[in-house]
């Protein structure tokens, strides 16, 4: 398994305030790493360090030459008076060819949105368009900052399934910031709990029993994490979710529970 980015003892200061301290991690192809932590923990700052938007105050970053990164921001802020269709929005990405747009939207089951105004999209539709845009350059690393913010629970299930499928197809690394403990954990390979420093890291099973994780999210959060992961691995392997969140069994029948 090849390592795409390595952070070693990275720290970030904003003036006199230390936002990140002694961060070391590896992003590897085919792996999903999920960042968890309270508000103000430095999660978005760490994402910007990985994207190369913030220079660390100390420590080192090593990355593969020519690394292609796709980024899905937490939220897109558009001028409501600016007429902008999904197609025109996708064309704003440098180097994009018109013929690349529809296949990317089809990949995330959003081709029907091609001529829709960006401002009229629902939360789930907007996130799928942002994901399609991030896939235009066939990224080796996909970075998602709270990808399901503003999306209902059913839409969240569908988005996480989709991200997992993309990881498998592209064999890309995925770095994801999330608060959705019980939803995201069924798909992630590694969890990193952040609160300016790395409190704990490892598989969901390991992290869910760690004292610092329990201190951060409480016993209920830890139980939720461990139980969901166990149930999903052992009892929910015979289905996936469509983009409306409906459960689809492997024989393509809908489950109407």
Swiss-Prot record:
What CDD domains does its record include? ABC_Metallic_Cations (cd03235)
Where ATP is bound, by residue? 37-44
* GO MF term list: ABC-type zinc transporter activity; ATP binding; ATP hydrolysis activity
Location within or outside the cell: Cell inner membrane
ABC transporter domain location is 5-220
Q: According to the UniProt record, what class of enzyme is this?
A: translocase
Q: How does it sit in the membrane?
A: Peripheral membrane protein
Q: Name one Pfam family in it.
A: ABC_tran
- E.C. number(s) listed in UniProt: 7.2.2.20
List keywords of the entry alphabetically. ATP-binding, Cell inner membrane, Cell membrane, Ion transport, Membrane, Nucleotide-binding, Translocase, Transport, Zinc, Zinc transport
Q: Which residues form the signal peptide?
A: none
UniProt keyword Hydrolase present: no
Q: Which GO terms describe its cellular component?
A: plasma membrane
Catalyses which reaction(s): Zn(2+)(out) + ATP(in) + H2O(in) = Zn(2+)(in) + ADP(in) + phosphate(in) + H(+)(in)
Q: Any one Gene Ontology biological process term?
A: response to zinc ion
* Major place of residence: membrane
Q: Which PANTHER family match?
A: METAL TRANSPORT SYSTEM ATP-BINDING PROTEIN TM_0124-RELATED, ZINC IMPORT ATP-BINDING PROTEIN ZNUC
According to its UniProt record, which protein family does this protein belong to?
Answer: Belongs to the ABC transporter superfamily. Zinc importer (TC 3.A.1.15.5) family.
Quaternary context: The complex is composed of two ATP-binding proteins (ZnuC), two transmembrane proteins (ZnuB) and a solute-binding protein (ZnuA).
> What does the UniProt function comment say about this protein?
Part of the ABC transporter complex ZnuABC involved in zinc import. Responsible for energy coupling to the transport system.
- From the Swiss-Prot or TrEMBL record, give the protein name: Zinc import ATP-binding protein ZnuC
From what organism does this protein derive? Photorhabdus laumondii subsp. laumondii (strain DSM 15139 / CIP 105565 / TT01) (Photorhabdus luminescens subsp. laumondii)
> What is the organism lineage in this UniProt record?
Bacteria, Pseudomonadati, Pseudomonadota, Gammaproteobacteria, Enterobacterales
Gene that this sequence comes from:
znuC
């Amino acid at each position: 398994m090849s390592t795409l980015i390595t952070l070693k003892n990275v720290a970030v200061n904003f003036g006199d305030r230390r936002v990140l301290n002694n961060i070391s991690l590896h992003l590897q192809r085919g792996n999903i790493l999920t960042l968890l932590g309270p508000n103000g923990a430095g999660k978005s700052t760490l994402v910007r360090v990985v994207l190369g938007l913030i220079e660390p105050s100390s420590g080192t970053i090593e990355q593969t030459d020519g690394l292609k990164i796709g980024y899905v921001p937490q939220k897109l802020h558009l001028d409501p008076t600016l007429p902008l269709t999904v197609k025109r929005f996708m064309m704003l990405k440098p180097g994009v060819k018109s013929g690349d747009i529809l296949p990317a939207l089809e990949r995330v089951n959003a081709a029907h949105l091609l001529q829709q105004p960006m401002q009229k999209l629902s939360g789930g539709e907007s996130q799928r368009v942002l994901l399609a845009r991030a896939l235009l350059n066939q990224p080796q690393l996909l970075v998602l900052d709270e990808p399901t913010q503003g999306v209902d629970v059913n839409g969240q299930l569908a988005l996480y399934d989709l991200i997992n499928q993309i990881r498998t197809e592209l064999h890309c690394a995925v770095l994801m910031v999330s608060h959705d403990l019980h939803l995201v954990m069924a798909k992630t390979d590694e969890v990193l709990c952040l609160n300016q420093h790395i409190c704990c890291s490892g598989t969901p099973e390991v992290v869910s029993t760690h004292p610092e994780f329990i201190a951060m999210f409480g016993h209920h959060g830890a139980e939720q994490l461990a139980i969901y992961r166990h149930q999903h691995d052992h009892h929910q392997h015979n289905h996936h979710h469509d983009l409306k969140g409906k459960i689809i069994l492997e024989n393509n029948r809908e489950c109407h529970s």
